[in-house]
Regions:
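N-terminal pre-domain/capping segments
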Residues: 1-95, 134, 167
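Acidic/histidine-rich catalytic cores of soluble enzymes
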Residues: 30-31, 61, 127-209
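Acidic-and-aromatic substrate-binding clefts and catalytic sites of carbohydrate-active enzymes
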Residues: 8-16, 34-45, 71, 110-114, ...
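Short secondary-structure boundary segments
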Residues: 35, 106, 200
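Active-site acidic/histidine proton-transfer and metal-coordination neighborhood
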Residues: 17, 72-167
């Protein structure tokens, strides 16, 4: 097992390119690069990150979900095309700085009356998204997130049945916030976990790590 630190841990303290230098200087061996804005999806910026990463292993890339990920599942052809254009640009960048995995949230589920997910339809969507990522040597990995698509155990396994290339990211904090036992998510993802997001809280519930 290799432990690492996400550039997101330095959000608003260091820009991504500088975060890599800081993490490397601290002796961190592996990282997830969290690209936070559309201008960071460019190949020029990716080359800057590649130059700054030093000996860091870039395990994965994480993108800001609300910028385009929900539209990858949309029915409007123009919006969906634009979303896939952004996806491919981001994956081309990931290929340049060496990320092999894409931590993915997908659809947001912010409304309490959200329609229950259709696993069969979602599997077709995920197959299309996964194929686009694979063009750049990147594996699509669905993360459990309490306010996004995968917010309860059972959904990953149902989607994976129709999209066998899909992998999973287990997030400890998000499992806690979903109010489901974390063991249920681990069981749901069994055999498919790509990487794990760890965090810790103090006695007041404040994130420490």
């Amino acid at each position: 097992m290799i432990s690492g630190v996400s550039t997101a841990s330095l959000f608003m303290r260091e820009m991504n390119e500088d975060a890599l230098t800081v993490l490397g200087g601290l002796g961190v061996k592996s990282t997830e690069i969290f690209l936070t804005t559309l201008s960071e999806y460019s190949e020029d910026f990716a080359r800057l990150l590649a130059a700054r990463r030093g000996e860091l292993l870039v395990n994965s890339v994480h993108l800001l979900n609300t910028q385009f990920e929900p539209q990858l599942f949309g029915s409007h052809p123009r919006a969906k095309k634009d979303a896939f254009d952004i996806l491919r640009r981001a994956m081309a960048s990931a290929q340049i700085f060496g990320a092999k995995n894409y931590t993915f949230h997908g659809i947001t589920r912010l409304k309490k009356n959200s329609v229950p997910p259709d696993a069969g339809k979602l599997a077709a969507n995920f197959s299309e998204i996964s194929a686009a990522c694979a063009e750049y040597g990147v594996t699509l990995c669905l993360e459990n997130v309490h306010w996004a698509l995968y917010n309860q155990p059972g959904l990953f396994r149902a989607i994976h049945a129709g999209c066998p290339n899909l992998r999973a990211v287990f997030d400890v904090k998000q499992a806690r916030l979903s109010c489901y036992p974390y063991q249920m998510y681990i069981k749901d993802m069994e055999g498919c976990i790509s990487h794990v997001h760890l965090s810790d809280v103090d006695e007041n519930g404040k994130i420490c790590l």
